[in-house]
């Protein structure tokens, strides 16, 4: 008689229940229960506080022929598994709390309905031990509580998050009926299920034995890393004498452990839906393990707190975020699934709630989809849409692909096109005439506005004029904010202001009027 297992098979020991990854022994059961198709998982990874646009944005290139930006270099080797979306977001600029809500709720005013992850979890999370996981890196930011949540329930209320890897591990891989004192006495969860594992290994074929061995090794490594975190060298320290009491001893290892647990939970089908915040929007984390002494939020305002040193520190933090995205993709690629890798049959949504980290623009929001989603999307592409696209259109498209019966979401009633290779309207710059005029101390320039790519002049904008030196825009924060210069970047404008001629280059130092050539309006602040 042959041994048959289903996807809900566990290795069991006293006080422990360990879910299994896919084995060939399960194939007959899988064909019976889901038509032979592997389950598709949905994972979101949130990056706080936006980006430095010149370091993030892709300028030029086509759908299939494009060069990834400097901030994308940590995960550039995954290019063929990525769908990079550009011109995502609504008009104007936003508060930290509203931009955070937008990330998974389509619009900041969508406050009475579930977030997209919860709607997808309702569809795909009913057959797993855990309907969904909501994870974070930081505690609550009480000044603006909305900065701390991206997941919302059916009433529009925040879904509680978990930030402790040990509690997540217990929730996923320990029997909840086991007494906590007994749990702590276990040297290793694997010891508790060792006999069951050996018995299964004797009955399994060679390929399954290799997969099972790899799986148990991963669990053992993860548990050991959790133990290392718990035994961090701070036992005898008088915390009242520390400058920053309560600061995590090893943030990098904590985050990577959480990513290990997410990948493991998805791989074992413990859950099919997970969200993880790498920090609150308005994050006050100090990345001292990177040699940084200022809070992330302070550094994100690189215009008003401008210095080359501060910008370098911000970019170092942002690159760390990108490295964690890369870490997750590497983990998911390393795990075998029924018909490929875990990533092949997952859809990972990575991004932020705002674009320009200082001005909080709600345009050109960083947004990337990774994985094939079991054929839901076509990757290896860069889609820059002709006009700003509400994030709700993306959410609507994703929900429909996951089988959610929904025709509109937030303020969007049309799904975002192009994700699966279907036609979409790409960005094409309209023709315009560029020129510059100077009359006394007044300068008027018409052309494409851009933010300087020189990291030594992060506050400087330029208007490109055909056949002439670019006009330099060198203004105080008030003009930067009131005229929403960050919003108009990359578009054609006519700008008038007072300025001077510096050795043949015209420099505008005070803006008096700004007009979009094609009717782009920043709108009002979204809170």
What do these predicted ranges mean?
Residues 66, 476-483:
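N-terminal post-signal-peptidase region of extra-cytosolic proteins
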Residues 457-475:
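OB-fold (S1/OB) nucleic-acid-binding surfaces
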Residues 502-523:
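OB-fold/S1-family single-stranded nucleic acid-binding modules
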Residues 1-430:
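Ligand-binding pockets and gating/stacking loops
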Residues 444-449, 490-499:
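OB-fold and OB-like beta-barrel modules that bind single-stranded nucleic acids
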Residues 428-441:
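Short boundary/loop segments of OB/S1/cold-shock single-stranded nucleic-acid-binding domains
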């Amino acid at each position: 008689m042959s041994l048959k297992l289903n996807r809900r098979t566990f290795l069991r020991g006293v006080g422990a229940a360990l879910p299994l990854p896919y084995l060939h022994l399960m194939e007959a059961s899988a064909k019976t229960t889901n038509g032979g198709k592997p389950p598709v998982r949905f994972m979101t990874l949130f990056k706080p506080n936006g980006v430095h646009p010149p370091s993030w944005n892709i300028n030029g290139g086509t759908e299939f022929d494009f060069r990834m930006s400097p901030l994308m270099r940590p995960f550039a080797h995954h290019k063929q598994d990525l769908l990079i979306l550009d011109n995502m977001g609504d008009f104007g600029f936003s508060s930290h709390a509203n931009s955070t809500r937008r990330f998974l709720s389509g619009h900041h005013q969508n406050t009475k309905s579930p977030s997209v992850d919860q709607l997808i979890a309702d569809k795909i999370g009913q057959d797993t031990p855990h309907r969904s996981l909501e994870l974070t890196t930081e505690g609550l930011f009480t000044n603006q509580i909305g900065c701390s949540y991206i997941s919302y329930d059916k009433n529009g209320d925040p879904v509680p998050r978990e930030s402790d890897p040990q509690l997540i591990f217990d929730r996923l891989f320990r029997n909840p009926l086991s007494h906590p004192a007994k749990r702590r006495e276990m040297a290793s969860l694997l010891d508790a299920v060792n006999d069951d594992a050996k018995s299964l290994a004797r009955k399994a074929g060679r390929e399954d034995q290799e997969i099972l061995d790899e799986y148990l090794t991963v669990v053992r490594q993860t548990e050991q890393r959790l133990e290392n975190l718990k035994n961090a060298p701070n036992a005898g320290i008088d915390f009242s004498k520390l400058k920053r009491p309560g600061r995590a001893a090893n943030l990098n290892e904590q985050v990577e452990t959480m990513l290990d647990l997410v990948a493991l939970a998805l791989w074992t089908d413990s859950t099919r839906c997970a969200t993880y915040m790498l920090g609150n929007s308005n994050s006050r984390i100090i990345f001292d393990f990177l040699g940084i002494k200022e809070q992330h939020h302070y550094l994100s305002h690189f215009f008003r707190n401008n210095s080359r040193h501060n910008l370098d520190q911000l970019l170092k933090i942002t690159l760390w975020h990108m490295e964690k995205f890369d870490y997750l993709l590497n983990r998911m690629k390393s795990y075998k699934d029924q018909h490929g890798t875990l990533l092949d049959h997952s859809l990972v949504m990575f991004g932020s709630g705002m674009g320009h980290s200082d001005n909080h623009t709600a345009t050109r929001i960083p947004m990337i989809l990774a994985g094939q989603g079991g054929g839901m999307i076509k990757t290896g592409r860069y889609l820059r849409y002709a006009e700003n696209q509400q994030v709700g259109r993306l959410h609507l498209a994703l929900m429909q692909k996951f089988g959610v019966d929904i025709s509109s979401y937030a303020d969007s009633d049309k799904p975002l096109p192009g994700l699966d290779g279907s036609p979409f309207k790409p960005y094409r710059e309209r023709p315009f005439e560029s020129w510059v005029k100077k009359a006394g101390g007044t300068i008027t320039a018409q052309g494409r506005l851009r933010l300087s790519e020189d990291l030594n002049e992060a506050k400087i904008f330029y208007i490109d004029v055909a056949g002439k030196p670019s006009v330099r825009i060198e203004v105080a924060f008030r003009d930067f904010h009131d005229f929403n210069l960050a919003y108009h970047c990359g578009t054609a404008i006519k700008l008038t202001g007072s300025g001077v001629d510096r050795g043949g280059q015209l420099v505008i130092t005070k803006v008096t009027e700004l007009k979009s050539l094609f009717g782009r309006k920043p709108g009002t602040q979204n809170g």
